[in-house]
């Protein structure tokens, strides 16, 4: 049970740090406008699934952001190692967060119902 709280705490710290690293350390223009929305940790803290959103809705921008994040993984892990007091920095997997787009789509559908 205590392990669950640790994974949540480590996930929150990684989320905060990765957002800061993307803003201050990564200079790749493909990751500009990327925001980390959530981090899901594996129970043993070996893998972190990092969910992100991007301001643009264009498919090409989403693809470029994914490639940019994958290229910046080494830099991000190195900075995490400097900033976090963990025995082993988890492997990072970046996944586009579809929940915000899904929520916007439902909101639009509800607004259309109100108009009819």
From Swiss-Prot:
Localization in the cell: Cytoplasm
Chief place where the protein resides: cytoplasm
GO terms of molecular function: ribosomal small subunit binding
A GO cellular-component term linked to this record: cytosol
Keyword NAD (UniProt): no
Domain of life: Bacteria
Subunit: Monomer. Binds 30S ribosomal subunits, but not 50S ribosomal subunits or 70S ribosomes.
Name used for this protein in its record: Ribosome-binding factor A
Species name: Streptococcus pneumoniae serotype 19F (strain G54)
């Amino acid at each position: 049970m205590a392990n669950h709280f640790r994974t949540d705490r480590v996930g929150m710290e990684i989320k905060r740090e990765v957002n800061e690293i993307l803003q201050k350390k990564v200079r790749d223009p493909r990751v500009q406008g990327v925001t980390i929305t959530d981090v899901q940790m594996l129970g043993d803290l070996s893998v972190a699934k990092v969910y992100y959103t991007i301001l643009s809705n264009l498919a090409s921008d989403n693809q470029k952001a994914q490639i940019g994040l994958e290229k910046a993984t080494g830099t991000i892990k190195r900075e995490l190692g400097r900033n976090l007091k963990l025995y082993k920095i988890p492997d990072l997997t970046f996944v586009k967060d579809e929940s915000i787009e899904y929520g916007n789509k439902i909101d639009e559908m509800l607004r259309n119902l109100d108009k009819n």
